[in-house]
Amino acid sequence: MHEHLKEKLAILPDQPGCYLMKDKQGTVIYVGKAKVLKNRVRSYFTGSHDGKTLRLVGEIVDFEYIVTSSNLEALILELNLIKKHDPKYNIQLKDDKTYPFIKITAEKQPRLLITRNVKKDKGKYFGPYPNAQSAHETKKLLDRMYPLRKCSNMPDKVCLYYHMGQCLAPCVKEVTEEQNKEIVDEIIKFLNGGHKEVRSELETKMYEASEKLEFERAKELRDQIAHIDAIMEKQKMIMSDLVDRDVFGYAVDKGWMCVQVFFVRKGKLIERDVSMFPIYDEPEEGFLTFIGQFYENSSHFKPKEIVVPGSIDSELVERFLEVEATQPKRGKKKDLVELANKNAKIALEEKFYLIERDEERTIKAVENLGKQLGIETPYRIEAFDNSNIQGTNPVSAMIAFIDGKPAKKEYRKYKIKTVQGPDDYESMREVVRRRYTRALKEGLPLPDLIIIDGGKGHLAAASDVLENELGLYIPMAGLVKDDKHKTSHLIIGDPPEPVMLERNSQEFYLLQRIQDEVHRFAITFHRQLHGKSVIQSALDDIPGIGDKRKKILLKHFGSLKKMKEASVTEFVEAGMPKNVAETIYSYLADKKTL
């Protein structure tokens, strides 16, 4: 531990507040809150931790803290700090999980819509529906039962919906405000839980139609009743008070937290939400952070009541969210919390089972690959690929797989330095020489298997450098592609012999992942360099632009396209003098010069 950390830990206050953990660049990597800052912050640097927390602690070189007057203030501050700094180790609940709502528009001739975009308008919103299919089925039923306008724009003649009895055709007929209000009121009654009442009314109308020998009408009403029954069958009544509430449960294991939310609407359990994420805090603190972010999402409306597990400070939740929060001791609500807890525990168990199963499969694939090639199990595999499009910016890339999984910190990029023109074989010789000369010099771990993305020529070039120049005898195989540029087979030995693998085997899938990954890494690097060279060459003829300013512009804008779209002011903001900014702008505006 850094000495200055020990000094700061010794003077931490025993008050509530927030703490910000920083890495060696001074970047905030984690924000947390605590009832007692002294105890919580010190706990990171004492005792035993799981692997994820150890990784976090290993990156901490400094921290700050902010004392607050209460736990509630700490919770609010924490959420704001997470928004501001976006730390990589914090819970990241994104707003992309939006649920659909059913909307009745406030137009003169209202419409019934499905939307995920809730606006502050005069429309009426019902939901959310975590199950999108349920929302669409409900709307489809309402469209059949209540003839509101369907078209977004008023056509000049009636459409098919009018002939189907699903629209009153306000485009060509007068539909009064009273008529629309009557229909809208019926829809609202249905969506607010009045299914039984609506069903009863339809049943009465069906019998009346039968008595009048209006069999087509009776059949239509019977079908509507059947649709209501089908939808209601999926939403069983679990609470008799018809209160809208969200019921929370959670479980923690192996450094992960799973939170399950049951959405109870009008007494019915309509759906659940599952979130799973790494946790570096006490479970109760992690849960409070989660619930704060959960209701910041625009698709999560606060219900009348929030039900939380017994370990959570419900008073704090209530004051923070400004909604009733309860901790049931008995009864149906307690049963629901326990069910949510149980589901969260099962979800974590399934996650770890799948991880362990995948790890077993991956290790087995590595072992089988070694057997197929007649070598020791290649726990560490390094793979090389060249990228050279039209002879410009030749590069190579090396990736590493350890225990069958990508080790991205071990990846390396190489600009080709000694080869003139496009020469794949010489490029391969150069990068293999550079990689393993450095590995020997610095005592870096050597691979159990080297894979060269290429055929016999590439393999021969790499083997020659490895054995004859460096004196290393590491198993090396060439990865051969088919005519569709897909993984075909390996070649190994001297002379190289093909090794065919079963295409549905785990070891073949492993090779595919390695080939795809090294190709992706190499070509991404090539495109980055190519993009930079395009920008630099485009700026060569502009007066006042030397290498230093080229680098500044490249770093600020990133692409020629963005530079061409920029204004004089934006070039000044990038650090260019105004006269130079005007020159750049004029030059790039003249497309003939590019």
From Swiss-Prot:
Kindly list the biological process annotations in GO that this record carries. nucleotide-excision repair; SOS response
**What span is annotated as the signal peptide, if there is one?**
none
Record InterPro entries: GIY-YIG_endonuc, GIY-YIG_endonuc_sf, GIY-YIG_UvrC_Cho, RuvA_2-like, UVR_dom, UVR_dom_sf, UvrABC_protein_C, UvrC
The UniProt record lists the GIY-YIG domain at 14-91
Q: Which GO terms describe its cellular component?
A: cytoplasm; excinuclease repair complex
Q: UVR domain: from which residue to which, for each copy?
A: 196-231
- CDD domains, alphabetized: GIY-YIG_UvrC_Cho
Cellular localisation: Cytoplasm
Please give the Gene Ontology molecular function terms for this protein.
DNA binding; excinuclease ABC activity
**Per UniProt, which keywords does this protein have?**
Cytoplasm, DNA damage, DNA excision, DNA repair, Excision nuclease, SOS response
The record's PROSITE patterns line, in alphabetical order, gives: GIY_YIG, UVR, UVRC
Instruction: Kindly list the residue ranges recorded as spanning the membrane.
Output: none
Q: Does the keyword DNA damage apply?
A: yes
Q: Mind telling me which PANTHER family this protein's record contains?
A: UVRABC SYSTEM PROTEIN C (PTHR30562:SF1), UVRC/OXIDOREDUCTASE (PTHR30562)
Q: What does this protein do?
A: The UvrABC repair system catalyzes the recognition and processing of DNA lesions. UvrC both incises the 5' and 3' sides of the lesion. The N-terminal half is responsible for the 3' incision and the C-terminal half is responsible for the 5' incision.
Describe the subunit structure.
Answer: Interacts with UvrB in an incision complex.
Family as reported in the entry's similarity comment: Belongs to the UvrC family.
Q: What is the name of the protein in this document?
A: UvrABC system protein C
Organism, by scientific name, is Bacillus cereus (strain AH187)
